[in-house]
């Protein structure tokens, strides 16, 4: 799993 995916997931979670 690339860090980009993790960053995106984290951003989505933080947004919601």
UniProtKB/Swiss-Prot annotation:
GO terms for biological process: defense response to bacterium; innate immune response. It is found in: Secreted. Its main location: secreted. The modification Phenylalanine amide is found at residue 16. GO terms for cellular component: extracellular region. Keywords: Amidation, Amphibian defense peptide, Antibiotic, Antimicrobial, Immunity, Innate immunity, Secreted. The keyword Lyase does not apply. Belongs to the frog skin active peptide (FSAP) family. Temporin subfamily. Antimicrobial peptide. This is Temporin-1Tq.
